[in-house]
């Protein structure tokens, strides 16, 4: 059983604070943290909290700097960074968590110019926000091209997608959707449950998945 969020907007916290929180949670959970991050999108929530979201360009410029800072603090003894949004000098993050070289970093989103490019460089896990298999396959290929540009094997990155169990509780549809995405290289299907999150759906959903033969481990 893993622990994490899918995903936290990076603008809510300084990446140094987030790195320390991540290390602490990785320790407390016994090395089960999945660090899910994104550039941020929720204008209503950001406005309610009085946190500046910024333009799309600003969000992604800040996000890319954040990824560099996070990776440094999670893997290095000290980190020095001089960016537009963040400046660190001989910064430490100790103790680090048990997962080495760092907890898996998951980046969510499908933007081809910035999100997938940043994913190729910094992520261990990419989350596709959901859509038909053809769209997933196209985004997968864009991600692979970005990986090729920097000499990275795209197989190093886990591929996941959202699936939704509707109020009608059509378990067979969830399984069919997962199978269609699996044929295009999906590694992990993440099922969103209908509100009010009735736990009684879990057993029939698990049975449908188990009976489908889709489980690999």
Tell what function each PLM region has.
Residues 1-217:
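Active-site-adjacent structural elements that line small-molecule/cofactor binding pockets in enzymes
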């Amino acid at each position: 059983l893993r622990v994490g969020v899918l995903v936290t907007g990076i603008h809510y916290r300084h990446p140094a604070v987030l790195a320390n929180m991540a290390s602490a949670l990785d320790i407390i959970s016994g090395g089960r943290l999945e660090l899910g991050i994104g550039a941020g999108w929720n204008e209503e929530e950001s406005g309610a909290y009085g946190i500046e979201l910024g333009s799309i360009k600003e969000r992604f410029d800040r996000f890319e700097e954040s990824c560099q800072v996070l990776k440094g603090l999670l893997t290095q003894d000290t980190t020095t960074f001089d960016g537009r949004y963040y400046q660190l000098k001989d910064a430490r993050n100790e103790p680090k968590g048990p997962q080495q070289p760092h907890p898996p970093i998951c980046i969510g989103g499908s933007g081809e110019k910035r999100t997938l490019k940043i994913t190729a460089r910094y992520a261990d896990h990419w989350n596709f926000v959901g859509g038909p298999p053809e769209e997933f396959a196209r985004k997968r290929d864009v991600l692979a091209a970005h990986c090729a540009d920097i000499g990275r094997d795209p197989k190093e990155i886990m591929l996941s997608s959202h699936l939704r169990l509707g109020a009608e509780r059509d378990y067979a549809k969830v399984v069919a959707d997962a199978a269609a995405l699996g044929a295009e290289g999906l590694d992990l299907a993440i099922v969103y449950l209908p509100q009010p999150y009735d736990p009684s759906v879990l057993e029939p959903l698990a049975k449908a998945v188990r009976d489908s033969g889709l489980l690999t481990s």
